[in-house]
Amino acid sequence: GHVKDVLVEYLACGIDPEETTIYIQSDVPEIAELYLYLNMNAYMGELERSTSFKDKVRANPDNVNAGLLTYPVLMAADILIHRATKVPVGKDQEQHLEMARTFGNRFNRLYQNEYFPEPYAFTYSKSLVKVPGLDGKGKMGKSEGENNAVYLSDSPEIIRKKVLKAFTDGGPTSEFQD
């Protein structure tokens, strides 16, 4: 269900399957294996300092678990497994990319090999951006709630309602008054 929906959205956005490798993360056991190796050399302090971890702990203190703590290591494994050097990320993922470089360099030193190149952010603009959510507070994304983002699968009417309710600078609007 969900995998097919995501694939349809990728294709609708113009991703060319002849030029792009599309895969299901859970179908690649090497990612989990690399995650384990990287985890064994990730330090608690650096993981606890992760901005995303601290934000999630503040938002939901009753659900602090190892998966949440080590999520940046999984993201690093996703990047490093491909030996990627250019990674399309937003401003909010910059710290995770820095951690991926740290974990990759640590792995290289430990095994005295330059296997993982350093990954860097790829963007078409001069700086990384963070797309704000419709509520004007956090980022736009599925983890921030159904009504805080516009989805490709949203109907035109749903999109219109979401946009009309979106947080703005508070200035008057001349068009689209309910």
Go through each PLM region and give its residues.
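N-terminal Rossmann-like or analogous alpha/beta NTP/dinucleotide-binding catalytic cores
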Residues: 1-77
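Active-site cores that bind ATP or allylic diphosphates and position pyrophosphate for catalysis
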Residues: 54-178
